[in-house]
A protein has these predicted regions:
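Bacterial Sec-dependent N-terminal signal peptides
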Residues: 1-6, 10-42
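First exposed extracellular module after export/assembly in secreted or surface-exposed proteins
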Residues: 32-221
Length: 221
């Protein structure tokens, strides 16, 4: 019962962040699928890639996997599992990875104030588009923004590199009433003039970006 609750909680978080899930939590067992952000690690015995969740549970792929993209701390992983087995395996759980896991891009955390000038507003952003991973370890965002109207699938990766997300705090001030304020800034790089922003008309929401909150917390006075 305790393990079932753990899976259901993961599904609830997944729904809030727009992550897909399909869980069979019936008492007779069954299978389920889930897409979830994990920390990427390696098995101390085999050296193979494994995944770790917020509670330090380890997820062991049944076959060797390679994570695509630029290496970072977190990856988005789609997997299936046997429910009865999953519920009894303790803190090391067997999973069947579906597709190729992808590293999440890491956003910059800055101690310098970033003025609003030169930044762009985000569309459709709310608290349901974010997730605190672990005990204030990482902040994961799923923002909606606009890419250039000429963007096609072949040029998407290049276009996305021009969209920069920065989380900043004012290192020169102390927390007010013991509350640390973090602010998000969104910039589109390599735009010649402000008028050129009118050409950014294609909405894009299939992007996840994470920030390492630990660095900000450690540095804050």
């Amino acid at each position: 019962m305790k393990k079932m609750k753990f899976v259901v909680v993961m599904a609830a978080f997944a729904a809030s962040l727009g992550i897909t899930s399909c869980l069979d939590t019936s008492s007779s067992g069954g299978t389920g699928t889930l897409t979830w952000p994990f920390k990427v690690s390696s098995d101390y015995m085999t050296g193979k890639t494994i995944f770790v969740d917020e509670a330090d549970n380890e997820y062991i792929p049944t076959t060797a996997v390679t994570v695509s993209g630029d290496r970072s701390d977190l990856a988005m992983v789609s997997f299936s599992y046997d429910y009865e087995q999953f519920a009894t395996q303790g803190d090391r759980k067997d999973i069947t990875v579906l597709g190729t896991p992808e590293y999440l891009p890491k956003g910059e955390v800055s101690g310098e104030v970033i003025p609003e000038e030169g930044t762009v507003s985000l569309s459709g952003f709310n608290t349901q588009s974010l997730l605190i991973w672990g005990y204030n370890d990482y902040l994961i965002l799923n923002p909606l923004f606009y890419v250039h109207e000429s963007t096609v699938s072949e040029t998407l990766d290049t276009e996305l590199k021009n969209h920069k997300f920065t989380l900043y705090y004012d290192a020169a001030t102390k927390a007010e009433n013991d509350v640390m304020k973090l602010k998000l800034r969104y910039q589109i790089l390599n735009v010649g003039t402000e008028d050129a922003l009118a050409d950014y008309t294609k909405s894009y929401s299939y992007c996840y970006v994470y920030f390492d909150l630990r660095s900000a917390i450690r540095a804050y006075p």
